[in-house]
């Protein structure tokens, strides 16, 4: 049973629901469309956890990783949970929960460093930095075993993961760099844990 994968998906879903529907400052106006589909970054949790170069420099270093717990919009959370379930299950079936969690966190951390201090991103959210890290680990495991079918993940799910991987590179320059740096972090984590 993929303990890390399921637990992480549950955590990001709860944070998404709380931040989008419940813990919004009374001074903020959030439309029903923003709550249900488009998303917003006006909630208390988002303000406390999103990636911010300025706030990291002031000592709020948790933001290098905590931003991976946040999502803006229904499509964002659905696509990231789906990808996490697929690649997380595949990697966790080979490495176990602890190493998979460390690969995810390490990838998110490396991407956070890159995006905050090299790219100078002023605000960032999303688990995709860690997911792309797990995708890198998945690729390394596939190369090591000689096949992408090294895990119990069905072929259809691997196709969905491939679409997610390619599609995630086409949504914008900043997002592409988040994904590239997360993938690079995953390669480093893979060299450590595989």
Model regions and ranges:
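A detector for small-residue-rich transmembrane helices and their helix-helix packing motifs
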Residues: 1-194
